């Protein structure tokens, strides 16, 4: 499972012109599910997202987590992150989970996030989405679980 974590000052996701998820300061995370992933990987990714220290403390050091700052968590499914880009001029998606598994694990991740944290929003799995964000820093990390 992969999560592209971006620290944001604000972000929103639209589907067909309608805002389906939005946060103020926090983390926008693009999530890709891979064929061998399970709920265990989703649990590990969520733990890392809530506790990864990417927000600055009073001394300007990245020492605070999402939980510490009380920011929002916006989860957006993006199977293209699992693409194999090593060969040729076209990405291969054979390294991405089948849609049914991707939907199941993304939904599990989202439900666990909502159960463990108050400020959670999401895009819509499989939809054509427009993601708007104000990247803070920019601070971006690829998490591979």
UniProtKB/Swiss-Prot annotation:
<protein>
    <recommendedName>
        <fullName>D-aminoacyl-tRNA deacylase</fullName>
        <ecNumber>3.1.1.96</ecNumber>
    </recommendedName>
</protein>
<keyword id="KW-0963">Cytoplasm</keyword>
<comment type="subunit">
    <text>Homodimer.</text>
</comment>
<keyword id="KW-0694">RNA-binding</keyword>
<dbReference type="GO" id="GO:0000049">
    <property type="term" value="F:tRNA binding"/>
</dbReference>
<dbReference type="InterPro" id="IPR023509">
    <property type="entry name" value="DTD-like_sf"/>
</dbReference>
<comment type="function">
    <text>An aminoacyl-tRNA editing enzyme that deacylates mischarged D-aminoacyl-tRNAs. Also deacylates mischarged glycyl-tRNA(Ala), protecting cells against glycine mischarging by AlaRS. Acts via tRNA-based rather than protein-based catalysis; rejects L-amino acids rather than detecting D-amino acids in the active site. By recycling D-aminoacyl-tRNA to D-amino acids and free tRNA molecules, this enzyme counteracts the toxicity associated with the formation of D-aminoacyl-tRNA entities in vivo and helps enforce protein L-homochirality.</text>
</comment>
<dbReference type="GO" id="GO:0106026">
    <property type="term" value="F:Gly-tRNA(Ala) deacylase activity"/>
</dbReference>
<dbReference type="Pfam" id="PF02580">
    <property type="entry name" value="Tyr_Deacylase"/>
</dbReference>
<dbReference type="GO" id="GO:0043908">
    <property type="term" value="F:Ser(Gly)-tRNA(Ala) hydrolase activity"/>
</dbReference>
<dbReference type="GO" id="GO:0051500">
    <property type="term" value="F:D-tyrosyl-tRNA(Tyr) deacylase activity"/>
</dbReference>
<feature type="short sequence motif" description="Gly-cisPro motif, important for rejection of L-amino acids">
    <location>
        <begin position="137"/>
        <end position="138"/>
    </location>
</feature>
<dbReference type="GO" id="GO:0019478">
    <property type="term" value="P:D-amino acid catabolic process"/>
</dbReference>
<keyword id="KW-0820">tRNA-binding</keyword>
<keyword id="KW-0378">Hydrolase</keyword>
<comment type="similarity">
    <text>Belongs to the DTD family.</text>
</comment>
<dbReference type="InterPro" id="IPR003732">
    <property type="entry name" value="Daa-tRNA_deacyls_DTD"/>
</dbReference>
<dbReference type="GO" id="GO:0005737">
    <property type="term" value="C:cytoplasm"/>
</dbReference>
């Amino acid at each position: 499972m992969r999560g592209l974590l971006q620290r944001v000052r604000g972000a929103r996701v639209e589907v067909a012109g309608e805002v389906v998820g939005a946060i103020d300061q926090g983390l926008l995370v693009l999530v890709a599910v891979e064929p061998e992933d399970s709920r265990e990987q989703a649990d590990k990714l969520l733990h890392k997202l809530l506790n990864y220290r990417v927000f600055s403390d009073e001394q300007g050091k990245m020492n605070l987590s999402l939980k510490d700052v009380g920011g929002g968590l916006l989860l957006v499914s993006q199977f293209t992150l699992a693409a194999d880009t090593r060969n040729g001029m076209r990405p291969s998606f054979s390294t991405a989970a089948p849609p049914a598994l991707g939907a199941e694990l993304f939904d599990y991740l989202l439900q666990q996030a909502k159960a463990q944290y108050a400020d959670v929003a999401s895009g819509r799995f499989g939809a054509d989405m427009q993601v708007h964000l104000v990247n803070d820093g920019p601070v971006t990390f690829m998490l591979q679980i």
